[in-house]
Each structure stands twice: as C-alpha cells, then as structure tokens.
Amino acid sequence: MTALTESSTSKFVKINEKGFSDFNIHYNEAGNGETVIMLHGGGPGAGGWSNYYRNVGPFVDAGYRVILKDSPGFNKSDAVVMDEQRGLVNARAVKGLMDALDIDRAHLVGNSMGGATALNFALEYPDRIGKLILMGPGGLGPSMFAPMPMEGIKLLFKLYAEPSYETLKQMLQVFLYDQSLITEELLQGRWEAIQRQPEHLKNFLISAQKAPLSTWDVTARLGEIKAKTFITWGRDDRFVPLDHGLKLLWNIDDARLHVFSKCGHWAQWEHADEFNRLVIDFLRHA
C-alpha cells in the first residue's frame, strides 16, 4: 500500500467562484488517473485528511488521483460566513477548485455535509461529475421514522456552541458504533483541530442562523441527478436517519444502496476495508 502522510500531500490553491475571491482552499493530493474528490463532514474540527486517511492509499493504489478537500470554513481553508445553504456554497467551492486545477470532470465521494455538497454539485454542474458516492448525506429534510434533528446533530451544535473535550467525547460516542475505536489519539487529534481555528466554530453558528438545516433539503430535485450513484449508510447512524437512504434510492434514476451493520455515521472510517473495496469496484465497473 502507498505510504502517504498529511504533510507530504498538503497543498493550497486560490479559487475564484461566486462568493469566493482569491479564497484559499487547502487540500491533500496523491496519485494519478481519474480524479476522485473526497468531501468531509461538518463536525467541529473536521477536515479532508482526518475524514479520509483510511481511504486515500487504497484509491491511489487502484489508479486514481485523489483529492481530499477542506471545505470553506474548515481546517486549513479560509474562514467564511455563508448566507446560503452550505451544501450549495460548498458545491461552488468544489467547482472553483476544479477550475483552478484544470479538472474537467471528477468522481465525488461525500460524507454527511460532504454528501450534501456532492448532491448539490451533481444538480448544479451535471457535466462536471463522473460518479457519485454518498455516505449518510445531509440535506434531505424530514424523516419518516426519526425525530429531527437526531441526537448526533444536537451534540454537534452543542460542541460548536460550547466546545469542550467532554462534549467532543460524547459526540464521538454517538458518531461511531464501535466504542473501542474512540482512542485518546483520535480524541486528542480532533480536539487540537477544534482549538486551532476558533473562528471556524463561530462562523459555522452564524451561518447556521442565516441558512438553517431546513434550507438544505434538495429532495424535490433528486430526480434531476443523472450520475451513477452509490449510496452507503450505517445501520446504526444517529446523525442522519437510514430512511434518507431510501429517499435517494427511490428518486435517483441510477442508484444502488449498501447498508453496513454495526456502523455509525462514518462508514468510510469504521468499515474502511469493505468501503474501499465496494467503492473502487463501483468506480471501475458500474
């Protein structure tokens, strides 16, 4: 397996797109071949590398150019307050990144907020997307079975508003099914990321007031998506309800759904080996 590190793959690029002028986006890049852009979730301290370091090596070895993008207002990318729903604004930033790097088309892999970003990109820029891979994406409105917002989202906003090590631990306990994966190394790494950028936390809450989660819902437009789509979900997800996966399956013309048992909101991390195998097979053969 290719040995990669965060520092050896770390890069910056300035993007110019609606709402972004000479805006610094940080990303990690490795490999050659068709481009796969991986989009992280929206929890405090999230970033491309921390979300996908268990996936980048196998995808590079499979012959792909992999880009792990820090979304605007996260990790090492510039700070921002958003006046529109975050999935749409983030999708514009993905286009800006692709334009700056001369990438005509890319496959998108999106988890949670990153899934909402990928959905919006597929809707706004259908000629620029290859295949679409979603893991528990946000932006799909109410649930048939679960009260909204779910337990994990409530903890996420609590952590944004009152960041503490204990609240972070509580959120990760809801985030992951397998509690043995919540190591001191994982907790400390995420806590350090949260403390590094206090402005990002404040701006996220301001943005959420301007464009709350209810504005993210793109369910009515899912039928417009023409990209081949692979949906994955954790059966035990306590952030985004499993029935949202059925919404996607019912409404996207060319879609398939895989549900991982004993899995929370981070399928690509909790079940990395199986996730990598399934998605690489989808990219190669679907």
Swiss-Prot record:
Q: How is its activity regulated?
A: Inhibited by 3-Cl HOPDA.
Top EC class of this enzyme: hydrolase
The entry's keywords? Aromatic hydrocarbons catabolism, Hydrolase
Q: Where is this site: Transition state stabilizer?
A: 112
Mutagenesis or variant effect for residue 265 to A: Unable to catalyze the tautomerisation of HOPDA. Extremely low hydrolase activity
Biological process GO annotation list? acylglycerol catabolic process; biphenyl catabolic process
Q: What Gene3D superfamilies does UniProt report for this protein, alphabetically?
A: alpha/beta hydrolase
Q: In which pathway does it act?
A: Xenobiotic degradation; biphenyl degradation; 2-hydroxy-2,4-pentadienoate and benzoate from biphenyl: step 4/4
Q: What is this protein called?
A: 2-hydroxy-6-oxo-6-phenylhexa-2,4-dienoate hydrolase
